[in-house]
Amino acid sequence: MTKRVLISVSDKAGIVEFAQELKKLGWEIISTGGTKVALDNAGVDTIAIDDMTGFPEMMDGRVKTLHPNIHGGLLARRDLDSHLEAAKDNKIELIDLVVVNLYPFKETILKPDVTYADAVENIDIGGPSMLRSAAKNHASVTVVVDPADYAVVLDELSANGETTYETRQRLAAKVFRHTAAYDALIAEYFTAQVGESKPEKLTLTYDLKQAMRYGENPQQDADFYQKALPTDYSIASAKQLNGKELSFNNIRDADAAIRIIRDFKDRPTVVALKHMNPCGIGQADNIETAWDYAYESDPVSIFGGIVVLNREVDAATAEKMHGVFLEIIIAPSYTDEALAILINKKKNLRILALPFNAQEASEVEAEYTGVVGGLLVQNQDVVKESPADWQVVTKRQPTETEATALEFAWKAIKYVKSNGIIVTNDHMTLGVGPGQTNRVASVRLAIDQAKDRLNGAVLASDAFFPFADNVEEIAKAGIKAIIQPGGSVRDQESIEAADKYGLTMVFTGVRHFRH
């Protein structure tokens, strides 16, 4: 019995060679449109799809394979006489292999000048239908959606005259994943077009980026996936210039670091991070001095940490960083000399480059947090704040230097794990108190870390003070300026305590919990 393959592909990589090998094995080839032209031009004899259907391609190719002669040939069960008799009675030829990939919908909508009409025209209808029909009948039909699978199919056909059931089942599973992702991407596009922010169904499409050695701990299996529509300013899209593959924890920490530095666009800034918390932030008129401040913030914790810089890394800065053990360095660019310094004798140092000019576009993405049996979705904490909207609630107003320091501290506290406290001056962090289960413990931790550098320091809290004991601790340490959201039923007690000790305190009206 003659074996038949239907080939209709938009990605023609390797298809001529694949078809030529099938011909050598005695297969009859049915093809459509541009695929048929490509195969015919290569000297591969094919049968036109309309010779199979008895119906011409029409409506600019929208209707060509949606026909019983095609889907009957794909769906007929070879183990049921009734199916085979129905095929024979209706002159339906059986199809044993389907090779289809879909209209480039993703590539189309990624074009900067794409129109809605272009997007709609690149929604494939016939292709997914054939793939699904063939995949459903994988007991008898082999279906190929990925050119990477051509070789294994040819190997099995050459060796055995047919593919194994295990291969057909695996390829069918791949097809259903592929068509599901294709439809999900179309749904995502249309959902955005109509402005629907809370769809009743949520399907996310990601592609495998990296198979990881392990997850957060060695006993945890893990992989890294990238959005089907990539975000330019993201670790998934970063260009790695040196070093080993990123680990699971590297990726989470690096993501936290590039989020933090988005809030420090106005001046050269360096952020050092460890275990999802900033351990040093420095800001200056040049990137080398900003590094100095970030390093001096906490020379101990930065060891084995991640550093992100928002300006090009020059040789002088690279020379200083070279002397510190770091896991990852991230920057918009590096001078050739700086890169040579960093790579020298540090073959494992992971060096990444990111397009910092794409930061704003990354801020509009939703955040997803998995919980057992569910998924939490929220927009990112990127609310635009202005000191003009803040309220000084104490009798004493901040000095100009304090006001600058408070603004710096308020940017920095946003990414400290709750309950979060941070102590800074106007250009660097001095002490961080993250993740304590009561706020006064976080206050003590941050103050203890800042120690003898508290002269002129200010303190920021990610949420309100529930009791005045926090202010008492702050005043006792000698800190004279506080910034916090306010909003406690006991705010007045904290205000009175601040006035008692001559402190200035600013309420922002915006909470920045981070869990």
From Swiss-Prot:
The keyword Zinc does not apply. It catalyses: (6R)-10-formyltetrahydrofolate + 5-amino-1-(5-phospho-beta-D-ribosyl)imidazole-4-carboxamide = 5-formamido-1-(5-phospho-D-ribosyl)imidazole-4-carboxamide + (6S)-5,6,7,8-tetrahydrofolate; IMP + H2O = 5-formamido-1-(5-phospho-D-ribosyl)imidazole-4-carboxamide. Pfam families: AICARFT_IMPCHas, MGS. Residues 1-145 form the MGS-like domain. One of its GO terms (molecular function) is IMP cyclohydrolase activity. CDD domains: IMPCH (cd01421). Its EC number is 2.1.2.3, 3.5.4.10. The keyword Kinase does not apply. PROSITE patterns: MGS. SMART domains: AICARFT_IMPCHas, MGS. InterPro entries: AICAR_Tfase_dup_dom_sf, Cytidine_deaminase-like, MGS-like_dom, MGS-like_dom_sf, PurH-like. Keywords: Hydrolase, Multifunctional enzyme, Purine biosynthesis, Transferase. HAMAP family: PurH. The IMP cyclohydrolase activity resides in the N-terminal region. Belongs to the PurH family. This is Bifunctional purine biosynthesis protein PurH. It comes from Streptococcus pneumoniae serotype 19F (strain G54). The gene is purH.
